[in-house]
Amino acid sequence: MKTLILVVIALMVIEVKSDGYLMVRAGREKGCKIWCVINNEYCDKDCKLKGGNYGYCYFWKLACYCEGLPTSSPDIWTYEKNTCST
């Protein structure tokens, strides 16, 4: 029983991370993915500024992809948040 309680407490303490495309949150391109061609350094820097672990330029999608962002981060692009073409 003590082990079960310990496991439950440990799961509550562990922070859940998620991966996804970085999103522009202001200006003319608000709601769009942050685009790139081959600039891994820019994507990595921007990812880390937003609380992620590692970012890179996903060449086939021409967008910055970030790994290890907090799940509650508003910087993760989703279809629901896509206001790029409006």
From Swiss-Prot:
In its keyword annotation, does this UniProt entry include Cell cycle? Answer: no
| Keyword tags | Disulfide bond, Ion channel impairing toxin, Neurotoxin, Secreted, Signal, Toxin, Voltage-gated sodium channel impairing toxin
* Pfam families per the UniProt record, alphabetical: Toxin_3 (PF00537)
* Signal sequence region: 1-18
Q: Does the entry feature the keyword Disulfide bond, yes or no? A: yes
Q: What is this protein called?
A: Neurotoxin LmNaTx34.2
GO MF term (any one): sodium channel inhibitor activity
- Where, per UniProt, does this protein localize? Secreted
Similarity annotation: Belongs to the long (4 C-C) scorpion toxin superfamily. Sodium channel inhibitor family. Beta subfamily.
> What tissues is it present in?
Expressed by the venom gland.
> Which segments constitute the LCN-type CS-alpha/beta domain?
19-85
Annotated domain remarks = Has the structural arrangement of an alpha-helix connected to antiparallel beta-sheets by disulfide bonds (CS-alpha/beta).
